UniProtKB/Swiss-Prot annotation:
Residues 140-154 have a biased composition (Basic residues). GO terms for molecular function: RNA binding; structural constituent of ribosome. The gene is rpsI. It comes from Salinispora tropica (strain ATCC BAA-916 / DSM 44818 / JCM 13857 / NBRC 105044 / CNB-440). This is Small ribosomal subunit protein uS9. Residues 133-154 are annotated as: Disordered.
Length: 154
């Protein structure tokens, strides 16, 4: 019986340890996650016509506010890929503003996964920064996080 010595590495095994280079996007969907406040968004982008779907509804139906629609489309407009990808988003938790911010972050991350050369433009515009602000917790003895009960001198 022959023992295999761990220090010996065959040339084929050395090649197997080389870093993996991903194939071009093709028809493979890219999945990313974005978070803001209490909102969590999972996004899949696939090559398409530029349609954005949120929880099975159209973007305009899910986010009636033009401000939120503009906020969400900004990464696609900045990279000039608004007509190249279809975005399918699963949104959970939070309110409309939190969900819109989380969706923008997820789309920006997905665009980088598809085309790493877009990173400097998205970074400069601030689309890759996770907004870490969250609601401050309420303290005992206070009415809210910082609001004290009314003070009566007498």
């Amino acid at each position: 019986m022959t023992d295999i010595i761990a220090t010996e590495v065959a040339p084929e095994a050395a090649e197997a340890l080389a870093p993996v280079v991903r194939a071009p996007l093709g028809d493979r969907p890219i999945q990313t996650v974005g978070r803001r406040k209490e909102a969590i968004v999972r996004v899949r982008i696939v090559p398409g016509t530029g349609k954005i779907t949120c929880n099975g509804r159209d973007l305009e139906a899910y986010f009636p506010s033009k401000v939120h629609q503009q906020l969400i489309k900004d990464p696609l407009v900045t990279t000039e890929k608004a007509e190249e990808f279809d975005v399918i988003a699963n949104l959970r938790g939070g309110g409309t503003t939190g969900q819109a911010g989380a969706l923008r972050l997820a789309i920006a991350r997905a665009l980088i996964a598809s085309e790493p050369d877009d990173r400097p433009a998205l970074k400069k515009a601030g689309f890759l920064t996770r907004d870490a602000r969250a609601k401050e917790s309420k303290k005992y003895g206070l009415k809210k996080a910082r609001k004290a009960p009314q003070y009566s001198k007498r």
